[in-house]
UniProtKB/Swiss-Prot annotation:
Cofactor: binding comment: May bind 1 zinc ion per subunit.
Official protein name in the record: Protein translocase subunit SecA
EC number: 7.4.2.8
Cellular component GO terms held in the UniProt record: cell envelope Sec protein transport complex; cytosol; plasma membrane
Cofactor(s) named in the record: Zn(2+)
Any one GO molecular-function label of the UniProt entry: metal ion binding
Enzyme class: translocase
Chain's gene name: secA
Catalytic activity: ATP + H2O + cellular proteinSide 1 = ADP + phosphate + cellular proteinSide 2
Localization (cell): Cell inner membrane; Cytoplasm
Organism, as annotated: Pseudomonas fluorescens (strain Pf0-1)
Keywords, alphabetical: ATP-binding, Cell inner membrane, Cell membrane, Cytoplasm, Membrane, Metal-binding, Nucleotide-binding, Protein transport, Translocase, Translocation, Transport, Zinc
Amino acid sequence: MFAPLLKKLFGSKNEREVKRMLKTVQLVNAFEEKMVALSDDQLRAKTAEFKDRIAKGETLDQLLPEAFAVAREAGKRVMGMRHFDVQLIGGMTLHEGKIAEMRTGEGKTLVGTLGVYLNALSGKGVHVVTVNDYLARRDANWMRPLYEFLGLSVGIVTPFQPPEEKRAAYAADITYGTNNEFGFDYLRDNMAFSMEEKFQRELNFAVIDEVDSILIDEARTPLIISGQAEDSSRLYIEINKLIPKLKLHVEEVEGEVTQEGHYTVDEKTRQVELNEAGHQFIEDQLTSIGLLAEGESLYSAHNLSLLTHVYAGLRAHKLFHRNVEYIVQDGQVVLVDEHTGRTMPGRRLSEGLHQAIEAKENLNIQAESQTLASTTFQNYFRLYDKLSGMTGTADTEAFEFHQIYGLQVVVIPTNKPLARKDYNDLVFLTAEEKYAAIVNDIKESMAAGRPVLVGTATIETSEHMSALLEKEGIEHKVLNAKFHEKEAEIIAQAGRPGALTIATNMAGRGTDILLGGNWEVEVASLENPTPEQIAQIKADWQKRHQQVLESGGLQVIASERHESRRIDNQLRGRAGRQGDAGSSRFYLSLEDSLMRIFASDRVKNFMKALGMQSGEAIEHRMVTNAIEKAQRKVEGRNFDIRKQLLEFDDVNNEQRKVIYHMRNTLLAADNIGETIADFRQDVLNATVSAHIPPQSLPEQWDVAGLEASIASDFGVKLPIQQWLDEDDHLYEETLREKLMNELIAAYNEKEDQAGAEALRSFEKQIVLRVLDDLWKDHLSTMDHLRHGIHLRGYAQKNPKQEYKRESFTLFSELLDSIKRDSIRVLSHVQVRREDPAEEEQRLRQEAEALAARMQFEHAEAPGLEAQPELVGEEVDVALAAAPVRNEQKLGRNELCYCGSGKKFKHCHGQIQ
């Protein structure tokens, strides 16, 4: 009730933030005259002066006004660009660890230099994160002259980079790279076998460009390093033959069955389910081809893998469509990003889904993979001491940024007032009528000399639009996932008079559409252009620029609404950059997926009740409200999925922190003798307690079992029964002491034989390898736990609490296994004396030999009830890989196959 009044009196929170920063802008401006008077050398010397002042205790906040003034003056001299006052506000927002929302064309890249320069003065490093390698290289090379003028070094991290080159890039003051590369390097560092192999320093400050794309759109997709698992291509091929035989089961709202079938599809959650008839049909089919034993159920424990393959095949056929979710290119299934329309070469769906699509398309089926290390962007970026970001569209997701990352969004005022006109949506009954209206709008705009950008949600739609335009004889360029190599070139010239560009979603994001075209691209295409040629190109561009402005600027036409309002706003933001003229219009139909799935029947009935004729459109607030309500509903559902992923990964993250801390401590230590001694003590205590229960009588002791366990775990045969017979004073505590003394003596004897230096080095390598191997198995176990944990809800149990409880138990067992297996290997192995340099070389060669079987994945995470597809990016890297396992693998906690009655991990599953 009082909120509007208070807002009117005191302004919104955003307005108060901007007003506060304007005071600091005045301080920066006060330094400008002084900076102009400095020579280049004097201006450059300011960087060393600032570093010295920081060393003496001055803070970055205290340096900010003068440092920003230095960066602004350097920008004028080196780049020929002066930071506007609103850009200074953007720089302050970044420095304070917030998100700056800036309209398209307001100079986000230049704004970034302010916060980056100030924070790089600390000497702790700054990471500038972009959405793709092209933008990382472009921005780094664009701003490199400015930073180097100020005495700062710049590095770029890219895939397939030589290790020394990548290490140098991370050692630079400012490092550019993609979110994927920074995340994978973090995982690689935590798989290194020496401190020298690591790349990253402490994670200090990151500036994320297009922060909404990275922290929101890609937040559901974990980063995974994996190795190859067993080959099951025949299974995919056989099941692929069965899926087309299944029929869709359809029910009306009242529950009346209109079509009997085997499976149902929920388009909202993108899930497909077999019904009872479907299960029976599949079981009969699998039995007939020999994949399922007679009378067995798909739900038997040993058939769950088969059930997973069936569902993968079903989803591949019914939920994934060629030229929508993926394309086939060079004999491979290439995924398409639903948010940008870009292809994602190398990225693969997991849980067998990618292989199922390959089988569906009759392509070569690639092997599945096993997780070796993983994290999420949510948890990776929260490792930075300070995080900030820039984007043109963040305000609609402000709640999520604050809830998940603790980041505040500040909307930065535009340098010039926004002149773009955003027209109301036009809604048609059918898609055919909608497309006809779009073509008419295009003709009118082009006749007026306006450039036109048509945004589509899928490749299929863009190709359909292209076909319609070709039929009309209208010249145009298509920018979608199939032609993304030409993105920058096409987008750069999309602002020419009468130019028509069809773009899938936000393809080409990061490159501005300049009215009249981009004259710099024209100059760059010439070989050794003369000053006269450059002047002529500029003059021609100026004429075109003025012509487009007078005709009304860029016209943005959207062929449908996206699930997210933010993506719609990004498309609108293509027009009207830096106060230019422009307009936008969305064309919709009741056949659009968003309207069909989420808009209520009431809206459809309302439109039909109006008696609309063919080709007529409606502009009504009720329809617009219904669309926005549907978008909010989808955004809320997607937020819940991302939040759920984080809640589950937070459990994994705490375990990840413990393991990675243990690993880094081992790597940094020259001597881990104390750690080995602690392991030995813990393993012995656990072994004794297992055979001598607390407060038990000697008659209850399992002495024979204790002797066998000591021999198995420590490689020493001790006559414990004989000791007890000969010494009446041996009770539980004194027996532990005697056992420990014997074990230490045996280990010291091994050390005398091998040499202390050789054994110390060997200890570290063995513990690291045991830790990595068991951690890999633990990750696999945790994955299986998470996939099935939602079923606990049927037993009236909280799945999240159950997951936390069971994962804690599994992690405790993991830590025990690391100790036991490390001691077991060290106790049994025979260490020979060898030159330490030779040993290091041997280990390095071993790691390189295994590297070919490593993969990178950027995978879509499963939810609880709905389990979305897992997306992964597979790239060869120079890291030690897991061995390929072709045999059936027993779980660590299953009974051993030898019949001993022990768990597999405590018997033949221990490292030999």
